[in-house]
Amino acid sequence: MINLFLYCRSGYEKECAAEIQHRAAELEIGGFVKTNKKDGYVIFQCFQAGDANILAQKIKLDSLIFARQMFAAKELLKNLPEHDRITPIMEALSDVRNAGELRVETPDTNEAKERTAFCRKFTVPLRQKLKNAGNLLKKENSSRPIIHVCFVASGTAYVGFSFSNNSSPYPMGIPRLKMASDAPSRSTLKLDEAFIHFIPEEEQEQRLSSGMNAVDLGACPGGWTYQLVRRGMFVAAVDNGPMDEGLMETGQVKHYQADGFRFEPPRKNIYWLVCDMIEKPSRVAELIEAWAINGWFKEAMFNLKLPMKSRYQDVSTILETMATVLEENEIKNFSIKCKHLYHDRDEVTVYLSLNPTQ
């Protein structure tokens, strides 16, 4: 494969492109980016055939901030005939054998959504043909590569594969979460997705358990507090604004009407710190650093609002500075991860663990 196809949020192609160029250069793999604003995807075309396979395997998807999903792809298939789109796709996938799953997708744009129904319908005959030809196993297998067919326009598609151990479990990298009817705001979905993304499923019961103590800085009206409460935690909600009455009636929330930047927890038994404040990202990062240096939490989830320009560079600098500050303050064992999640808008979610077990 010669191309690496990366899904991203529409409008963030430039950031995704800058990131993959940087990461490919670290592996000494040459290539160039092809993308258009609002496409919802980025193509990194390698100078050498086969290098895309290396990138798809060696660059961990979870380590990329702006890519939701990626796969190694052949050259763009154009002008697929309406009477037989399957044959050219089969020919392009001839060297992919015994894959475990097929995903026929589109980028996440309003225009592309018009092709969603076609993709669902087209999946059925294509899947059967791939099974008959040996490209796809008779039964789905989560340990085998995933075949991707992405229609970027009518009759135009990129085809390829991703490695199952370095791929999003969700089509196009988008988890479908339901908005709870009693949640105070849609921001609740951001923290819900963050917990699902950053905390392995087999560890969630232990690390997101009932009875834990948490602090939510900038809590009003309680979207993030809601996710902590529904997992059985006791929450110190810090905000000068009002909190949702339903949350307060649970008895699990204590509301501190205070400035989140000046608040100090009265008890130092906090496990989770969460923060979603509309503030300069560098200032929020400095606040989290101060809490970490004081040892006021074990795990933290916080959002950084993004500037309009140089977003990738600014986020990278903030994360690098945070790591340096923690090390300079004798915090040696920590883990920082960052992702532009589906439910994030002009922001990224950062996860910080002190003394991680892995």
Swiss-Prot record:
Gene3D superfamilies: 3.30.2300.20, 3.30.70.2810, Vaccinia Virus protein VP39. It comes from the Bacteria. Its main location: cytoplasm. InterPro entries: RlmM_FDX, RlmM_THUMP-like, RNA_MeTrfase_FtsJ_dom, rRNA_MeTrfase_M, SAM-dependent_MTases_sf. Belongs to the class I-like SAM-binding methyltransferase superfamily. RNA methyltransferase RlmE family. RlmM subfamily. Catalyzes the 2'-O-methylation at nucleotide C2498 in 23S rRNA. Its EC number is 2.1.1.186. Coiled coil: none annotated. GO terms for cellular component: cytoplasm. The active site is at K305. Keywords: Cytoplasm, Methyltransferase, rRNA processing, S-adenosyl-L-methionine, Transferase. S-adenosyl-L-methionine binds at S187, C220, P221, G222, G223, D239, D259, D276. This is Ribosomal RNA large subunit methyltransferase M. HAMAP family: 23SrRNA_methyltr_M. GO terms for biological process: methylation; rRNA processing. The keyword rRNA-binding does not apply. It catalyses: cytidine(2498) in 23S rRNA + S-adenosyl-L-methionine = 2'-O-methylcytidine(2498) in 23S rRNA + S-adenosyl-L-homocysteine + H(+). It comes from Shewanella woodyi (strain ATCC 51908 / MS32). The keyword Transcription regulation does not apply. It is found in: Cytoplasm. Monomer. GO terms for molecular function: S-adenosylmethionine-dependent methyltransferase activity.
